[in-house]
């Protein structure tokens, strides 16, 4: 898509055309073989780190039976993607809120607990995060 945009700009601006220098650039997350992907492989080369975290049985726990996310993804997002709230995880990291608001609503506490442990927050923070997310999730539920 970016190459199409640049090609169009070259045409419109009557600029000198050169071969795309990034055509074979391997960006972060690159996988050599993506033919047999599983759920965590959306993380590309980072999936191995999440699988390593999931060796801890508490982090291998699926957050909801209707969605494929596990607690290790919460910890990984806090450590590597600056996720800081339940909303960060369930809306922007996993998109669970948009895929299934009812399921995401029940995932709030199972997400808040490992996130709080990772970030050093207390039970009051967990409660506040769960309550805040419940209010938000209500707006996404199909009536």
Predicted regions and their residues:
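C-terminal accessory subdomains/tails of enzymes that are appended
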Residues: 2-143
